[in-house]
Amino acid sequence: TVRRMARDLRKALPNSIQVPNNQCVEFIPTKTGGRYRVEDKSGAPGTGLDFSAADTGFNMLGSNSARPADQQIADGDLIAVYNLGIAGSNAYNGDNTAAVSGTPSESGSPAETTITIASKQFPLPSGSNRFHVIPGTEKVVSYICSGGTLYRNANYAYSSSCPAPTPGTTPVIATNLDTCNFVYNGSDLQRNGLVQMTISFTNSGETVTQYHEIHVNNTP
């Protein structure tokens, strides 16, 4: 249980982890990332990502089709650039995200991938020219402890508080929970965040407590 949550959290978009209350941890997942071309060049491929005005596409350095299937950028995914998790650069609010429109195409040698997006002016460029990819089928995830059960909720409309799980519908990760506590320390760490999870299970009068610390990369 804890290991699965740790795997999920390590893939979280930088600066997207939050704990609305100690019974819930919420984050924006990512499936992959890449580097965008900064400047146009003559010939194809040659489209840089423009930060001075709304743009509808850019070139990624490298091949999309060469990636594992679950990491390939697809129609409906979201491109996120330099998420700081603050006003004006907050992926939860769509400040710095744009939806991929259509299937990315490749050309050139070495290969570059042309990614078409919904018109967007990204507020801030990445110092390392990086972007992250949020899966279109799972744009936000939360783990919620409720009524002695640990749920994994996904792809719901974002709000300032974790949504209540729907028993019988929301996927169950674990049952027989006795206590559950999530703590996140990220704002006072320059590059990394720390998620602390304490979960106790009780069954047949016996209690087992699992404690885990997960270091997450907050470099956008």
Model-derived features: positions:
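Short linear sequence signals and composition-biased patches located at protein termini or domain-edge surfaces
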Residues: 35, 147-220
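Extracytoplasmic beta-strand-rich oligomerization domains located immediately C-terminal to a leader/signal peptide
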Residues: 1-151
